[in-house]
Amino acid sequence: MPRRAGSGQLPLPRGWEEARDYDGKVFYIDHNTRRTSWIDPRDRLTKPLSFADCVGDELPWGWEAGFDPQIGVYYIDHINKTTQIEDPRKQWRGEQEKMLKDYLSVAQDALRTQKELYHVKEQRLALALDEYVRLNDAYKEKSSSHTSLFSGSSSSTKYDPDILKAEISTTRLRVKKLKRELSQMKQELLYKEQGFETLQQIDKKMSGGQSGYELSEAKAILTELKSIRKAISSGEKEKQDLMQSLAKLQERFHLDQNIGRSEPDLRCSPVNSHLCLSRQTLDAGSQTSISGDIGVRSRSNLAEKVRLSLQYEEAKRSMANLKIELSKLDSEAWPGALDIEKEKLMLINEKEELLKELQFVTPQKRTQDELERLEAERQRLEEELLSVRGTPSRALAERLRLEERRKELLQKLEETTKLTTYLHSQLKSLSASTLSMSSGSSLGSLASSRGSLNTSSRGSLNSLSSTELYYSSQSDQIDVDYQYKLDFLLQEKSGYIPSGPITTIHENEVVKSPSQPGQSGLCGVAAAATGHTPPLAEAPKSVASLSSRSSLSSLSPPGSPLVLEGTFPMSSSHDASLHQFTADFEDCELSSHFADISLIENQILLDSDSGGASQSLSEDKDLNECAREPLYEGTADVEKSLPKRRVIHLLGEKTTCVSAAVSDESVAGDSGVYEAFVKQPSEMEDVTYSEEDVAIVETAQVQIGLRYNAKSSSFMVIIAQLRNLHAFLIPHTSKVYFRVAVLPSSTDVSCLFRTKVHPPTESILFNDVFRVAISQTALQQKTLRVDLCSVSKHRREECLAGTQISLADLPFSSEVFTLWYNLLPSKQMPCKKNEENEDSVFQPNQPLVDSIDLDAVSALLARTSAELLAVEQELAQEEEEESGQEEPRGPDGDWLTMLREASDEIVAEKEAEVKLPEDSSCTEDLSSCTSVPEMNEDGNRKESNCAKDLRSQPPTRIPTLVDKETNTDEAANDNMAVRPKERSSLSSRQHPFVRSSVIVRSQTFSPGERNQYICRLNRSDSDSSTLAKKSLFVRNSTERRSLRVKRTVCQSVLRRTTQECPVRTSLDLELDLQASLTRQSRLNDELQALRDLRQKLEELKAQGETDLPPGVLEDERFQRLLKQAEKQAEQSKEEQKQGLNAEKLMRQVSKDVCRLREQSQKVPRQVQSFREKIAYFTRAKISIPSLPADDV
C-alpha cells in the first residue's frame, strides 16, 4: 500500500525496496526472503492491526480499497490474498443474513398453511363430486315416480323438485369453481416451494465458509445478469406478440349472440371504430397546418396550454400529497406478512365450509363405515375450530384496513402518474407556441425526473436489483370473492364462535353498542362484518384551489376557504361502506335432501321492533314515478312499532337510513356517521315500545337484506337474524339453519345456499351473505325462497317454515334493502287458489293450526291496530296545531287511506272493531305516499288512489333543499326542508365550521386564511421582489443574477447522491442472480400458457366454432386476460410510449416514497429494499392462467 511522500516519512527496513509494475502500481520487494508484497512494511507501525482499532473510515493493516469501473468500490485483503465487494468495516452483511433466516421461518409457516388450505379444498372437491353423483341419481329416481316427487306432504324423505334442481346446478358449479381454484393453487404452491428452496440454497451458500464473492466472480455474475436481462426482454416482446394474436383471435369469435358475422381483422372491427375515429380527431387537433386565422389559432393554443399547465401542476401537487400519505402509513414488518395472516383466516373459513358440507351430507345409501368416518371428521373439525377461540383479531383488522388504504392510495398514485405523463406529452405537442412551459424547468418536474430515470437504468447493479427486477406494478388482480370472504371473517372481538358466525358484531351490540354507536341493525352488522370503519385521517388538502388570477408559480395559490374533512361528516363514507358490498361473494354450500314445501303466495311484512333492526335503504322516485309505478315492499321506510321520525322527502333525494333502538339512537345512512337524536320540547312525545311487547309477538321472523349491484351483475342476499324461534317446538338436540334459493333455478348460476347451523335459541344472529351472479332482467323473473330448516342429531332434516319474496319489484339501487319477514309454517302456507285472493295477507276462512297460534295472531293484530289509531290521532293533533301557522305542504289523505286499508286487511279476520277517523288530513310531504308503516308487500293496489290524489292536488310550494354547511347567506328560507337529525340544531351547528359569517371582499384574492397563503415569485432579483431584510437595491451589482441561469451543481448534492447509493454485498448479488433466473423461468411458463391458449383457439376456429370455449367464457381470469390483450392491441405507439413513461415515473415515485418513509419512520431504505428482494421469491401471482379442466 503506497504512502504519500513527506518529510516525516519513515524509511524502509533494511533489505526492502519500492518498485512499480507496468501499470504504475507500487509494490515492495523483500530481498531478504526474495518475495514481493503489496503491503508497505512500515504499515505495521502506523496502521491499526484489527478492525476494532480503526477510527472513522480507516482500514486496518493488510487491507486496501480499490475501484473497478464495472463493480465500483471493492476491497482487497492482502494477507489472505482475497477480494470482496462488501465493506469489511460495516456489519450490514451480518444483518442481511439474520433477516434472511428470520424470513425463512416465516415463509415456512406460510407454506405449511397454504398446503393445508390446498388439502382442505381437495376434501371439499371430493365431497362435492360424490354429492353431485348422488343428487343426480336421486333426481332420476324421483322423477320416475310422479307421485313421490310432487307429493305435497312435508316428510323429510321427499324431495322438492325445484329445490332439488337448484341443488344439482349449485353443486355442479361448486365443483367447477373448486377445480379452477385447485388448479391455480397448485401452480402457486409450486412457485412458492421453488422460491423457498431457492432462499434456503442462498442461505446455505452465503452463510457457510464462503465469505463472499471475489472481484472476478462478481464480474462474471454481472455478465450473466446482462444476458438474462436480454432474454427476459426478448421474452416480453414475444409475450406482447402473443397477446396481440389472442386479441385478433378473440375478435373473430362471436362473443355477442346477436352478431352473426365475424371480423377478419382487428383494426376493421366495428368495436374499435370509435377508437380509430377518436385518434384521427386527436391527430387532427395537433396539426399546425390547419387553415384559418393565425391569430385565433394562436390564442386558442395559448388558452389550451394554460389549461393544460394548470392541470399538470394540479396533477403534480396531487402526486406529492399521495406520496406523503403513503409514507405516513405504517409499513409491515415483512412484505407479504399480511398475506400470510389472510391465508390463515381463509383456512379457518375453508374448514368451516367443509364442516358445513359434512353436516349436510346425504346419509342415504351410505354404509355404516362411511357414516362413522364422516362423523369423526366432523368432530375433528369442530375441535380444531374451537381451538382458535383466543386468536386476536382487532389488531389484524386494523392492519388489514391500513393495507386496504395503502392499496387505494397506490391505485390513485398510479392513475395520477398516468395523467401526469399524458398531460406532459400534450404540453410537448403544443410547445411550438411562444409561451414557454415554466413547469418543465421547475424543481421536481417530469422532464428532469425523466432524465434521471433514464440515467438510473443503465445496467448498474442497483438498477438490476431494485428498479428493474423487483418492481411490480399494481396489475395483480385480487379475487373479489376471496377479498369479501376475508372482510366478512374479521370480527370485532376475537376467536371463533361455533354456535354463531364469525362476525364483527354480536346480537346485543346491534341494539346498543358503545364501540360503534353509529351503526345499528343490519346496516351496522354489514358495515362491521366487512371490517369497514371511517377512513383514516387523510392529509389535509390544499386550503385553496388553483386560482387563475395568480400568474405566479405559487405553492398554495389563493382560493376559497374550505372546511377540513374531519370537521363534519361527508357523504363519501357511506358510499365507501356500501362499496364493501360490491365485492363478489359466493358461498359454496353442500347439498342434502329436502322436504316438499308448498310455495308461499302471501305473507305479512312487519318492521323492526326494539330488538334492534334496520330500516330499508331505498332510493325514492320522483312524483311521476310514484304515481305510475306500483309500491314495492321496500317502501315501508317508517317503522310503526318504533319511535316515530319525520322524514321529509324531496325531489331526487335519497331516503335516509333510520335505525332505532332502545337507546333512541339513529344512524344517518347517507353519511355513515352516528348522531344521537335530540328531542325538542316543541315536538310530540314518541310512542314508547317496551321490551315486554316482544313477548306478545309469537310469529317467527327473519331479517333479510337485498341488494343488486348493476356494475358486477351481482344479487346480494343477507340473512341477518332470526327472532321468536319459540313459536316452533324444536328439540334441544336439533339445530336450525336457513336455506336460500333463487327459483326457478338456472344451470349456469349458483342459486341455492345454506347458512351455518345454530342451536335453537330465542333469537339467532346469522349475518350470512350470499351472492348470485345474474343479470337484472333475469332476476326480475325470479323468486327468492327462504326456508327455516332443522337438522336432528341423526342428521334428519325437516323444513319448519318459510317465506317467499318476489323479485319483480326489487329496487335496483346501490343501497341495501332490508325488511323483516314472517315465517309461515310449512303446513300453514296457503296455496294459490284464485286471483282475487292474491292481495290479501290472511285468507278470511283460513284455518289456524291451534289455539296458541290464534291467540298470538289476535294479540299482534290488536296491538297493530291500536298503534295505527294512535298515529292517526297524533297526526290529526299536529295538523290542528300547524294549520294556523303555515299552509299544508302536501296531501296525506292517501297516506291515511293506505293505513286504514292495511289495518282493515289485517283485522278482517278477527276482532278489533276499531274505527279510524274519516276526516283526518295531516300535513305531510308530497312523497309520503312511498313511506307507509307496517305496509305489506301486496299494497300496490292502492296505487291508483295515490296517483289520483296527486293529480287532483293543486300545485303547492315545493320545499327548497339548502346545504347548511356551505350556505353563507344570512337570509333563511321559511320553507326549508331539513332532515330530522338536523332539526335539533339547525342554526347553531353551522357556526363552528364557518370561519366568519360575514365575508369581506376587500381581502386579497379571496377570503381564505391568510396564514396558509404562500406566494413565491419566480423572477429575478429586482426591486419589486427584494425581501425587506436584504440590503437596498444597487444597480449593476454583482449579486444581480437571473434565476434562469443554470448554476453548477454544488458538492453537497453530489455527496448526497453518492450517499444514497446503497451498499452492495455478495448476498445482494446472489439474490439478484436468482431472482433473474426465477423471473425468466416464470416468464417461460407464461409464454407456454399463451401458446397453448392460442393453439386451442386456432383449432376451434379451424373446426368452424363461432364461440369461445365455455371454460374461457366462465373463468374471470381468462376474461381479464382477453380484455388486457384487446386493450394492448388498440393502443397506438404514442400511447405505448406514454405507458412506458408512466411506469418509469411510478418507479421513481416509489423510490421517493421509500425515502420519505425513511425520514418519517426511521426505517432505512436498504432494509426496505432487502425485505422486498426476499419476499419476491415467495410471491407467486399467476397472471396467465392455464387451460381450464374438463367440465363436470
From Swiss-Prot:
List-wise, which residues carry Phosphothreonine? 1004
Which SMART domains does this UniProt record tie to the protein? WW
> Which terms are listed as keywords in the entry?
Coiled coil, Cytoplasm, Phosphoprotein, Repeat, Repressor, Transcription, Transcription regulation
Q: Where is this region: Interaction with PRKCZ?
A: 1031-1050
Q: Where is the composition biased (Basic and acidic residues)?
A: 938-951, 1124-1137
Which portions of the sequence form the region Disordered? Answer: 441-462, 873-895, 911-991, 1124-1143
Compositionally biased tracts (Acidic residues): 875-885
Q: Which residues form a coiled coil?
A: 121-194, 224-256, 302-421, 859-887, 1068-1144
Please state every residue range assigned to the domain named WW. Answer: 10-43, 57-90
Q: Which biological process annotations from GO are given for this protein?
A: cell migration; hippo signaling; negative regulation of cell population proliferation; negative regulation of hippo signaling; negative regulation of organ growth; negative regulation of transcription by RNA polymerase II; regulation of DNA-templated transcription; regulation of hippo signaling
**SUPFAM superfamilies noted in UniProt:** C2 domain (Calcium/lipid-binding domain, CaLB), WW domain
Start-end of Polar residues biased regions = 923-933
Cellular component GO terms held in the UniProt record:
cytoplasm; cytosol
Q: Which InterPro entries match?
A: C2_dom, C2_domain_sf, C2_WWC, WW_dom, WW_dom_sf, WWC/KIBRA_Hippo_Reg
User: Can you give the residue ranges of the C2 domain?
Assistant: 698-821
Offer an example of a GO molecular function term for this protein: molecular adaptor activity
Q: What does this protein do?
A: Regulator of the Hippo signaling pathway, also known as the Salvador-Warts-Hippo (SWH) pathway. Enhances phosphorylation of LATS1 and YAP1 and negatively regulates cell proliferation and organ growth due to a suppression of the transcriptional activity of YAP1, the major effector of the Hippo pathway.
Describe the protein's quaternary organization and the partners it interacts with.
Forms homodimers and heterodimers with WWC1 and WWC3. Interacts with DLC1 and PRKCZ. Interacts (via WW domains) with LATS1 and LATS2.
Name the record gives this protein: Protein WWC2
The organism encoding this protein is Homo sapiens (Human)
- Gene symbol? WWC2
